[in-house]
Structure formats: C-alpha cells, structure tokens
C-alpha cells in the first residue's frame, strides 16, 4: 500500500466524524500529498459486482479528487480507465491512482495534457483506442475555479481559461469520442451545485457549470436515438485538493459547514453515483442530473 492510500478508506462514521484544518495550496487543481487529512476515496467493505466488467472509461481529472474516487470505484466494478491529468505537478497523484487501480486487477493509462486543446482531446481518444481497443464510458470531470470579489476582477484571460477548461473541453473530448461510442455507452458530466444556487465569488465558474447542465440535457436529446445516455452529477461541497488550491485557509477550515448535513462530503460518497450512471442499472436514465450535496434541495 502506497503512502498516498493511507487514511483514504472510510465508513459512514468516518465521513460524519471527518475533521479538517485550515490549509491552502498555491496551484490548481491541488495535490493529495499536501492535504491534511487526505480525502476519503474508498468505502470500507465496498464489494464490486462486475457492473462495469470489461468496460473502458476515460476520466478527466482522474488523478485526484472526485475523478480519482470514480476511477477506483470503476475498477472495483471491473473497468479499465484512462486517467487524464493536467501537468507534471499531478504526476505523483496520477501514479498513485494507477497503482490502486492495478491493485484491484484493472489496467490504467495515464495521459498528461491540456484538455482545453482540441488536438490533445483527439489524441486522448486515439491513445485510448490504441491501448484498449474500444471506449464505453466518458467522464468529463476536470475543472478549475478562481474566486473573485467582483465581476470587475475577472480578467479576460481568467474568463477564457475557465470556460476553455470547464466547458470547451467537454465539447472537444466528447466530439473526439463520439464516433467510437456504441449503443449502450454512457457520458457523465460533472456540473455543480453552483449551477443551481449561484456563487457570488465564482461567477465565471458557476456560469460554466450552468452551461454543462444545458450541454448534458441537449446532448442527451441528440443522442437518444443512438441509445447513448448522457447524464450529469452536481456535487455540493466535496473535500478534494481543489478546495485548498482555491480558497484561503480560513475559508477551507469552514468548508462544507453550511450544507444541511453541516459537513463537507467525501469523494467516496459521490463516486457511486457515477457507477450507477455508467452501468446498466441506469439504462432508462438520460438527460438527468444527480445532486449529491449533503441535503440541499435545488430545483433542476
């Protein structure tokens, strides 16, 4: 067991009693090794039942956070994964995720690059097919966020970058993957509670998440006749490296406290939603968004 897996397996009681301190990281999307404590990526006693046996999934942002937990749960269910991560700073986390997937008896391909580049997205699909021969599940999960006190503080560069990473990338990668997705395939997009509630300091980020929700619904309609399902997951406050890489230590210390359950969620509490949407358990579900947010009721 690698050091990065210490304290990353938990039960319901561990989720409820989880304590975190104020902390901050300098660069997004943040890395596991600098977090104290680590997020909980696996559920104690979880046993897969081959729901994704022999399937191949591309998971963006799969090196840490939500994407990492999704990749591990997919491996428990028999899937091989392609993990796409942004830069060299995330390599250690990506390798730890790959190690865990391989411990579970599945294969994992790591690819580093900028998902805001359409050519790179095409290469991701190309390398996936060269390695595994087919593609069954696409999880569009990678994102970035940069809080600002005012709309006037959002530079043109930040606006363009946030939209390119968060929503343009989904268009690019989905377009690249679509010719190779067959009947029964599943596309899962990570949106956010901010798409429904808004966020006064994440105006551009929340706007991209609203766009993702509309993208999900529209694409689901477009692909229904091809029997390819498209759904979304809207996380609430989830404890991932992106949080200390986004907010001040003071805000991180109280992150999640405003949720109805009075705590942040863990990636392991979110990943089973992706398993459901990727598997044949959800064959009559498309165009929907699952809200995993600690009890907040949203209309959408």
What are these regions (language model features)?
Residues 91, 111-125, 156, 268-269:
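The beta1-alpha1 cofactor-binding region of Rossmann-like NAD(H)/NADP(H)-dependent oxidoreductases
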Residues 174, 208, 216:
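Active-site helix of classical SDR
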Residues 192:
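Residue(s) in the substrate-gating loop at a strand-loop-helix junction
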Residues 136, 152-171, 188, 212, ...:
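Catalytic Tyr-X3-Lys loop
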């Amino acid at each position: 067991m690698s050091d990065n897996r210490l304290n990353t397996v938990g039960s319901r009681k561990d989720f409820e009693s989880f304590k975190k301190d104020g902390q901050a990281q300098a660069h997004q999307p943040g890395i596991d090794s600098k977090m104290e404590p680590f997020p909980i990526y696996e559920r104690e006693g979880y046993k897969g039942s081959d729901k994704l046996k022999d399937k191949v999934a591309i998971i963006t942002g799969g090196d840490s956070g939500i994407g990492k937990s999704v990749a591990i749960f997919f491996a428990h269910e028999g899937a091989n994964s392609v993990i796409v991560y942004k830069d060299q700073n995330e390599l250690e986390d990506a390798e730890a995720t790959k190690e865990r997937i391989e411990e579970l008896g599945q294969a994992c391909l790591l690819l580093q690059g900028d998902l805001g580049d359409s050519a790179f997205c095409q290469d991701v699909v190309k390398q996936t097919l060269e390695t595994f021969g087919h593609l069954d599940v696409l999880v569009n999960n990678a994102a970035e966020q940069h809080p600002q006190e005012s709309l006037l503080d959002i530079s043109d560069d930040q606006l363009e970058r946030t939209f390119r990473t968060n929503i343009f990338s989904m268009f690019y990668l989905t377009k690249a993957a679509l010719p190779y997705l067959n009947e029964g395939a599943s596309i899962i997009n990570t949106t956010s509670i901010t798409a429904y509630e808004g966020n006064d300091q994440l105006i551009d980020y929340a706007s991209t998440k609203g766009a993702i929700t509309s993208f999900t619904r529209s694409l689901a309609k477009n692909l229904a006749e091809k029997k390819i399902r498209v759904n979304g997951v809207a996380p609430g406050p989830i404890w991932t490296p992106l949080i200390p890489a986004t907010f001040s230590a003071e805000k991180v210390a109280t992150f999640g406290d405003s949720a109805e359950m009075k705590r942040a969620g863990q990636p392991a509490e979110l990943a089973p939603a992706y398993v459901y949407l990727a598997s044949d358990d959800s064959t009559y579900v498309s165009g929907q968004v699952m809200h995993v947010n600690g009890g907040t009721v949203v209309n959408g």
